[in-house]
């Protein structure tokens, strides 16, 4: 069932860009676009403005995820993937990109740089205990389930 996300344009770096949209009927993420042109040198990271501020419904978050095509073709990804937009954040959405490739990558204003997935949030109540219930896995981590 769709939820309403209120959007405000911020930054005013040029003519308004299209609002994020789903590019196919089955897409999970809305495409976020760069609100200014830039070039990422190899090894460089940068916070890229989107020109948008969001008002997410209570009980939801925005997950900013990398675009697989940028990673596959250019080695460009996100430093903190996924990035989290809390429901009470009202500032401009920025995307932290990094160039893991060996060549500079140029972006034009309006290029798609990330995906925004809106998801419900479950809030946990923590209970301090002296022991945890046993499980088959136990404390094995960092690849232990594939051995």
Curated annotation (Swiss-Prot):
Catalysed transformations (reactions): dUTP + H2O = dUMP + diphosphate + H(+)
EC number: 3.6.1.23
Pathway: Pyrimidine metabolism; dUMP biosynthesis; dUMP from dCTP (dUTP route): step 2/2
Entry keyword Transmembrane: no
Matching Gene3D superfamilies: 2.70.40.10
Keyword Hydrolase: yes
PANTHER family given in the database record: DEOXYURIDINE 5'-TRIPHOSPHATE NUCLEOTIDOHYDROLASE
HAMAP family with a match to the protein in the record: dUTPase_bact
Family indicated by similarity: Belongs to the dUTPase family.
Name recorded for this polypeptide: Deoxyuridine 5'-triphosphate nucleotidohydrolase
